[in-house]
Amino acid sequence: MSHNFKKSLGQNFLQDKNIIEKIVNFIPLENEDVLEIGPGQGALTNLLVKKSKNVLAYEIDKELIPFLKEKIKAKNFTLKHEDFLKSEIDFQDKKIIIANIPYFITSDILFKIFENHKFFTKALIMVQKEIADKLIAKANDSNYGKLSVSSQFFANIKKVINVPRTCFYPQPNVDSAVVYFEFKNDIENIDIEKFLVFIKTCFSQQRKKLSNNLKNVYDLEKIKSVLKKLNLSFEVRPQQIDLNVYKILFYELN
């Protein structure tokens, strides 16, 4: 297919058959409903419809819609010409997400998924390698930050497939990785929106002390008291605290 690749949509289509097979075979899909974000020219989709129970794909590029409809005529395939970020998520059956997403909207898509985590069980998502390293980073790692804490609140995460830039067309300027998410069923009874804002506040100036970031929102004496209660130094920095401690901090300060 001759296609006018759109930089505005961040189009880099996965071409490598070996990588495609690794993605599709990573988890059993025979009895699963799959949601694919950005099927592109359908290289991954074509195998997904053969391996899974049902595939629902969201494609924003109207030029690709007739091509995909012609290429993939499987009865278990549903194609939506729709922006996933603007779509309403309300499924009767939980789905597995499989996606090769544009780098420039990675965070937007991830947080759309996190906000609707109850509709999904697992996800395999292709991201820029640098983002993958941030997603899986633990406290005291140089890659550890608000994305690490926020993402790990919703899911257990690991990097499972390294994908060189040569596996795509057009070829991007960076390497990628597939990240595996297992969404947690036991997320605490917590105000998720408020917690995510709290984490953003904690990491607002990552190189500064945590207390310095928090004092813009909370009373300084209360911050000192809570840090002392948790046996944390007043000098502690955001990247030195793990997810479980952040959850306790949130409860104590609110």
UniProtKB/Swiss-Prot annotation:
HAMAP family per record: 16SrRNA_methyltr_A
Subcellular location, record wording: Cytoplasm
Domain of life: Bacteria
Source species: Mycoplasma mobile (strain ATCC 43663 / 163K / NCTC 11711)
EC number(s) recorded for this UniProt protein: 2.1.1.182
Annotated function: Specifically dimethylates two adjacent adenosines (A1518 and A1519) in the loop of a conserved hairpin near the 3'-end of 16S rRNA in the 30S particle. May play a critical role in biogenesis of 30S subunits.
One Pfam family here: RrnaAD
UniProt keyword list: Cytoplasm, Methyltransferase, RNA-binding, rRNA processing, S-adenosyl-L-methionine, Transferase
Record GO terms (molecular function): 16S rRNA (adenine(1518)-N(6)/adenine(1519)-N(6))-dimethyltransferase activity; RNA binding
Binding annotation for S-adenosyl-L-methionine: N12, L14, G38, E59, D83, N100
Descriptive protein name: Ribosomal RNA small subunit methyltransferase A
Entry's family note: Belongs to the class I-like SAM-binding methyltransferase superfamily. rRNA adenine N(6)-methyltransferase family. RsmA subfamily.
Gene Ontology CC annotation, any one: cytosol
Coiled coil: none
Catalytic activity: adenosine(1518)/adenosine(1519) in 16S rRNA + 4 S-adenosyl-L-methionine = N(6)-dimethyladenosine(1518)/N(6)-dimethyladenosine(1519) in 16S rRNA + 4 S-adenosyl-L-homocysteine + 4 H(+)
